């Protein structure tokens, strides 16, 4: 049964468990338990974790909560986990446990308490608490100092002096990553005095890429939302006493007048995707996935494939004057486009199927948009992406416009005797694009898919030929029998030839049956000979074993006689009680 992980990516322990599973290629289903909607308090979830907290896992019959316990279990239960995460060395494991226990009582109260009471509380329906934030900041500062002076002392790259991260590194770094939701200046104020901690965070992030950035993307989006709220509050209530500025300046510092400029620079680095950007990304994906000279089919790794796409997007002439996007950003945007467009394709198919007489194409679009909103409670905003992808096999409509005009019929026309039917998604049934007609583009098969297809075709052809040959022989026999029964006439030249053919066919069948019988008889004879040889071998082995046992018994008897002879040769009083007992016992056995 597949592992189930119940998590909310806004939760630090949840992010640690998700990154660990992804890095170690553990197959799992991620089930969202929204903390904002209080889903962790539902009766259904409390059957899994009575504490009402995330993360929790279900692995077969096992239900487990607490992130540290989950990480230890996954490290021990799954063979794909590399040893450096939770080494077999018991002394190293003990040190990891000491770090994890310290984490719960020091770093976690400091980091979580500060972020909650200075930024996140309003999002959870709670008031901000500057006093609690100041207390948490003191705990956080002391914890960072302890990390740098004790756990990261010397030139250690990771905790405990290892060259690779452990579950302790992952758990603590995910804890500190929640500081990303703070204002940039506030976050740097807390971390910049601790250079070793910053290097350690970056080393752990690189060791878990690209999964670390993917899972922490929710923090980056939250940071953007909080920054917009700060800007709106600053614009509506300017002045040094602004409440929003106070939240980001707990501890005696102030954002100052450079807050807006800093936010503008950060937004320039993380600019939004525009429709032209989406079109370039889609073109890059289609070209990279369909070009037989470039694609390495199923043998290429995912990051190599996306690096090609990222290079294609960065080299686009229309984006020459803009900051380059990373390949993992392109992958995240593509996943969103693919998800939304696939959902809209289903709604568009449903609208085409329901198309009534007299409805125009615009009417169908309106119905599709309404179906999308009814199903997913949001508007479809990627029509430009759908229009780029609609002519490809994966995203094309399953209903043709011609059939839809006739009342939504989905009947297909047989094109040839090979069992091929017309369909809007069948490349063979789509005509060549003439006078602006649209043509569905098909993705080329990969190496393995092509070989499998050729093998299936060859096997199918061979089976069809055998069946056709068998049917032909049966039909010939049936015709001969029917003619003989119906036409009870004197044999002429034609009847003689038919009778000769029938006799020859029956003779051939009898010869085949006789050959099969002889073959089976020969196999039985060989089997009987084999059984006789095995029985003879067993008999010889049994005889040898009996002789061996007899020889062993004779050796034992001779040994006892030698011992008795030695004891009898001694004078009275020279033997001990045990030797006298042994001598009497041997004499009794001999008699």
Curated annotation (Swiss-Prot):
Any one Gene Ontology cellular component term annotated for this protein: peroxisome
Region annotation Disordered: where it falls in the sequence: 229-272
Keyword Signal: no
The family this protein is said to belong to: Belongs to the GST superfamily. Theta family.
Location, primary (coarse class): other
GO molecular function: glutathione transferase activity
Polar residues bias spans: 243-262
Residue ranges constituting the GST N-terminal domain according to the UniProt record: 1-82
Top-rank taxon, per record: Eukaryota
Enzyme Commission code(s) on record: 2.5.1.18
Protein name: Glutathione S-transferase T2
GO biological process: toxin catabolic process
Cell compartments where the protein resides: Peroxisome
Domain GST C-terminal: 89-226
Transmembrane segments annotated in the record for this chain: none
Swiss-Prot/TrEMBL catalytic activity: RX + glutathione = an S-substituted glutathione + a halide anion + H(+)
UniProt KW Transferase keyword: yes
